[in-house]
Amino acid sequence: MAMIPSISKLLFVAICLFVYMGLSFGDFSIVGYSQNDLTSTERLIQLFESWMLKHNKIYKNIDEKIYRFEIFKDNLKYIDETNKKNNSYWLGLNVFADMSNDEFKEKYTGSIAGNYTTTELSYEEVLNDGDVNIPEYVDWRQKGAVTPVKNQGSCGSCWAFSAVVTIEGIIKIRTGNLNEYSEQELLDCDRRSYGCNGGYPWSALQLVAQYGIHYRNTYPYEGVQRYCRSREKGPYAAKTDGVRQVQPYNEGALLYSIANQPVSVVLEAAGKDFQLYRGGIFVGPCGNKVDHAVAAVGYGPNYILIKNSWGTGWGENGYIRIKRGTGNSYGVCGLYTSSFYPVKN
């Protein structure tokens, strides 16, 4: 892709106006690109405007819009170069396509508190894949145990979203009822975690086992930490009976747990490929410095299915498949580092 020089503000505004008037306000559910889009400023601006429309992007002034357009161009160049490598995954113009990687890391990762595991909880030892008899495929979405993908926004509350996915799953499995529960309640009330500055999924799960949790529509998500309002919301909607830890650094143990219910997991999500992930089986590049909590809701012969909390404008409609079976005890992106699930009798 040839580098296209920065353009003047006046020219940018003129082209934007021309492109905007010509846009079809149809379905932009997938904003893709072709090699022709990379050949001129006008085509790039048209692509940018289509992407803005899809993701409801509004900038405060023309200077910010030009700034975001320049980042968008750089990310598109990176996406195009990466996708030509024929990896098992591909990148795309997702909701984060106008953000630099440094900005993305600051806003959307780093929300797992330093002590992301605990010695308070025991685990059942599972030595390897051959020690357990589990299905080849598991997808808790197909079994009606997973609610729609949520969006945590710029609050570092991934730990609460991760915990809630597992609570919703086990309640469905035990009772037959799928309900949405309150991430905001965990954000407000878990005093061992740090609100929007990070937290512990295991601590959130212990809170629900000790007290309970309200429905999401009773205690809706606000994206900021406030005081704990559980008493104001009336009786709890659900309660679990405990928390278990999955044996760390053991793929077989994690698969065994996922086969029984959705599981809270952590991983390293700060890389540019993770930021711009569009689909396929992700293999990295990434390390083991876990900085984000998600939920494992299934697996296949060569991947683990992850539900994220960045909305449906990222990944495979809010999901990512992470490569498994690599022989790395940490797992790709540190996925086997720290995993927990709620107990419901």
Curated annotation (Swiss-Prot):
Prodomain residues: 19-133
Gene3D superfamilies according to UniProt: Cysteine proteinases
Extract the InterPro entries matched here.
Papain-like_cys_pep_sf, Pept_asp_AS, Pept_cys_AS, Pept_his_AS, Peptidase_C1A, Peptidase_C1A_C, Peptidase_C1A_papain-like, Prot_inhib_I29
Kindly list the GO molecular function terms attached to this UniProt entry: cysteine-type peptidase activity; serpin family protein binding
The chemistry this enzyme catalyses reads: Hydrolysis of proteins with broad specificity for peptide bonds, but preference for an amino acid bearing a large hydrophobic side chain at the P2 position. Does not accept Val in P1'
Q: Where is the active site?
A: C158, H292, N308
Q: Which residues bind E64?
A: C158
Full protein name: Papain
Classification lineage = Eukaryota, Viridiplantae, Streptophyta, Embryophyta, Tracheophyta
